[in-house]
């Protein structure tokens, strides 16, 4: 997952109705393909999901979550981009800049909630 943070806050994305967990908010990202590093997967996912290039600033950590039928390890990176005004959403229906603890009160994807809590602790 990639967390974009700038003067507007953090960028959150809402999943489209035709996606798994429709209407849930998340940080952009996706599945790591075979023979792909987490970093390369992140860069590819931003191109596929938002049609932008990003640069990785640093790795924020790895969060684990177990759903009823599968387990995920979420590699989280802080990223930046000069193309944020050019975002074209392919799997999301809405974007939102989050700039206060109140703004974080969204219907988050379950696996992203610990990431959100960590960001709240560090920034708000």
Description of each model-found segment:
Residues 2-3, 17, 64, 68, ...:
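Short secondary-structure boundary/capping segments
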Residues 24, 86-124:
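Nudix hydrolase/Nudix homology domain
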Residues 47, 51-58:
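A SAM-dependent methyltransferase catalytic signature shared across enzymes that methylate proteins
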Residues 9-48:
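Conserved Nudix-box catalytic region and its N-terminal flanking loop in Nudix hydrolases
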Residues 5, 22, 27, 69-74:
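Short connector loops at helix/strand junctions that flank enzyme active sites
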């Amino acid at each position: 997952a990639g967390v974009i943070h700038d003067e507007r806050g953090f960028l959150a994305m809402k999943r489209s109705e035709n996606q798994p967990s429709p209407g849930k908010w998340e940080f952009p990202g996706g599945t790591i393909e075979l023979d792909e590093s987490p970093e390369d997967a992140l860069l590819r996912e931003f191109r596929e999901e938002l049609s932008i290039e990003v640069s990785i600033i640093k790795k924020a950590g790895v969060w684990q979550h177990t759903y009823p039928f599968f387990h995920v390890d979420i590699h989280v990176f802080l990223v930046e981009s000069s193309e944020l005004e050019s975002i074209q959403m392919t799997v999301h229906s809405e974007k939102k800049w989050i700039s206060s603890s109140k703004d974080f009160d969204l219907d988050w994807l379950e696996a992203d909630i610990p990431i959100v809590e960590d960001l709240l602790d560090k920034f708000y």
